[in-house]
Curated annotation (Swiss-Prot):
Its EC number is 2.3.1.46. Pfam families: Abhydrolase_1 (PF00561). It is found in: Cytoplasm. Keywords: Acyltransferase, Amino-acid biosynthesis, Cytoplasm, Methionine biosynthesis, Transferase. Transfers a succinyl group from succinyl-CoA to L-homoserine, forming succinyl-L-homoserine. Homodimer. This is Homoserine O-succinyltransferase. Gene3D superfamilies: 1.10.1740.110, alpha/beta hydrolase. The active site is at residues 157, 323, 356.
Amino acid sequence: MSTVLPEDSVGLVTPQTARFDEPLALACGRSLASYELVYETYGSLNASASNAVLICHALSGHHHAAGYHATTDRKPGWWDSCIGPGKPIDTNRFFVVSLNNLGGCNGSTGPSSVNPATGKPYGADFPVLTVEDWVHSQARLADRLGIRQWAAIVGGSLGGMQALQWTMTYPDRVRHCVDIASAPKLSAQNIAFNEVARQAILTDPEFHGGSFQDQGVIPKRGLMLARMVGHITYLSDDSMGEKFGRELKSDKLNYDFHSVEFQVESYLRYQGEEFSGRFDANTYLLMTKALDYFDPAAANGGDLAATLAHVTADYCIMSFTTDWRFSPARSREIVDALMAARKNVCYLEIDSPYGHDAFLIPTPRYMQGFANYMNRIAI
């Protein structure tokens, strides 16, 4: 059934594909001879190309950040609450670019793509990627679109790490960095969660060493468990308690190990089932490794202020009080380093019950603070 699109929507959008035939050297020592990036754009690029904003996605994100692909779509893009006319990233002012990162599974070249050298899917042979690899590939997309400098680069979670990396790798190509619910590197606990998720996939009998496509199967159980573990870390204890508590699906206990008895069990299984049907297992492994490897200050003995000494962008750092995956303390590490390096930075810590997922949820103070900063950006 067709729906009437909201007035503050960017409307119907069509994904585009950019192909690059110049080899891309990667941090792992390998290279990709050619690759494709799928992206969407919203709004119009002005004559001086000074109003461009790049959206960097998180672990399971993709290029479809706003609008609709068809009037029959049940939901808009994943960040539609923040991108559109009159929204924080106002498409009446900005030309917005959102892409599916290299290694993804939504159209950009990744493990599920055909390796031209073999005629088969890359699978586990796809090279391991880093955040800086993504930034280099994104810079090539900017060149292709005629964008010399971004007015702003915006991202939440892993997307925020990409935004931060941009300001270090290409300091003269970024005027503003909006880094939301992120961190300067993962804690040991976060790496541990990622490893549990990876082991769920790697030990699934249907994984076949990453060559499951050749076998005509998917490691559904492993992906499901990985998503269930990950999803717990995206929510706060308060929000889970309020949403589910100890409510049962029926009015009695079954006294077995197979029934789905609690509402929270049902929710996690649904999330896992849905995710396992749309996401690639090898991509999940790649994304979590890129998270683990992100540590830009390592080259300076862990001194983040020294690492940021050469940056020229202005920064807006936002965090959420109940986010325990990337707590406010992690955002303040970035803020403190920027201040020590004498850079321009503003910081907003937002009261929210929604945990790490709060960066996706349009609460009033978040939207107001986000919009206030974006409206200050000269174009």
